[in-house]
Amino acid sequence: MSHDLDPTGTY
């Protein structure tokens, strides 16, 4: 899960 604007679990 890679979020740019909303990192809710950047793995």
Swiss-Prot record:
The record's statement on gene disruption is: Simultaneous knockout of tal-1A, tal-2A, tal-3A and tal-AA is embryonic lethal. In embryos chitin secretion and formation of the cuticular exoskeleton appears to be normal. However embryos display a loss of denticle belts and dorsal hairs. Segment-specific epidermal sensory organs are present and segments form normally. The cephalopharyngeal skeleton is lost, and the head skeleton and posterior spiracles are deformed. In the developing leg, tarsal constriction occurs but the tarsal fold does not form.
Gene Ontology BP term (one): actin filament organization
Q: Which UniProt keywords apply?
A: Cytoplasm, Developmental protein, Nucleus
Q: Record's superkingdom? A: Eukaryota
Q: What induces it?
A: Polycistronic RNA up-regulated by ecdysone.
Q: Where in the cell is it found?
A: Cytoplasm; Nucleus
GO CC annotation: cytoplasm; nucleus
Function according to Swiss-Prot or TrEMBL: One of four peptides (tal-1A, tal-2A, tal-3A and tal-AA) produced from a polycistronic gene that function redundantly in several developmental processes. Required in early stages of leg development for the intercalation of the tarsal segments during the mid-third instar stage and later for tarsal joint formation. Promotes the post-translational modification of ovo isoform B (svb) into its active form which in turn initiates trichome development and promotes tarsal joint development.
Further information:
This protein is produced by a polycistronic gene which also produces tal-1A, tal-2A and tal-AA from non-overlapping reading frames. tal-1A and tal-2A produce the same protein from different reading frames.
Name of the protein in its database record: Peptide tarsal-less 3A
Instruction: Please name the source species.
Output: Drosophila melanogaster
Q: Which gene encodes it?
A: tal-3A
